[in-house]
């Protein structure tokens, strides 16, 4: 099966500081992949490259077997086709919530894709019920709590039914109840009810990863330190300590 994404020798730097350093990685379709690693290991950079928001200085990325390049996004039809298949929710959802109400936020994507008005109304109504947004539908997104903003951002992407969802730290800065709400939402949307969907998310929360992921990639200094079934990777405590994900870092090899 063609993977969702394949990266070969990918390099990327911010102001001369390497973020990804010759990264080789295959991300399969139909899996729930968690990206783990210390701050600065390259997780957020990787997600931005997978979404076509940035492009590598060297190396190659393919999406669904097709090269993911700047040139692809100059072709309107190709760009729209990619955006229909891939959705991205930022760590800070405020950067993608800009409509006057939650209802308008949910309708924005379908409007951009020129869905018929009847289809938009029906799908937005279903999303409001599906994601428990009824009491929030008429409110401005910027006045919502952190957990509510995250839920609206997720709903505004999932309403388009993307094949792949990219999430950057989905529960960062949320309280325990909001964290549990987001985890439950992800379990529902990417569980047995939707077996073909692909989730790729970064996190420092090992409890969330154990609950959601079936595949884990650990990044270290812009390279893959480990990848495999979630239970196997999460059992490698020395590796997780080295990645600052468990207390007791001692510098030893996994």
Curated annotation (Swiss-Prot):
Coiled-coil intervals, chain numbering: none
EC number: 7.2.2.11
Localisation: Cell inner membrane
A GO term from the CC aspect: ATP-binding cassette (ABC) transporter complex
InterPro entries reported for this sequence: AAA+_ATPase, ABC_transporter-like_ATP-bd, ABC_transporter-like_CS, ABC_transpr_CbiO/EcfA_su, ECF_ABC_transporter_ATP-bd, P-loop_NTPase
Membrane-topology annotation of the record: Peripheral membrane protein
Keywords: ATP-binding, Cell inner membrane, Cell membrane, Ion transport, Membrane, Nickel, Nickel transport, Nucleotide-binding, Translocase, Transport
Alphabetized SMART domains for the sequence: AAA
GO molecular function: ATP binding; ATP hydrolysis activity; ATPase-coupled transmembrane transporter activity
Top class in the EC scheme: translocase
Residue ranges of every copy of the ABC transporter domain listed in the record: 5-246
Subunit relationships: Forms an energy-coupling factor (ECF) transporter complex composed of an ATP-binding protein (A component, NikO), a transmembrane protein (T component, NikQ) and a fused possible substrate-capture protein (S component, NikMN) of unknown stoichimetry.
Entry function: Part of the energy-coupling factor (ECF) transporter complex NikMNQO involved in nickel import. The complex confers nickel uptake upon expression in E.coli. Shows very low activity with cobalt. Presumably responsible for energy coupling to the transport system.
Protein name: Nickel import ATP-binding protein NikO
Organism: Rhodobacter capsulatus (strain ATCC BAA-309 / NBRC 16581 / SB1003)
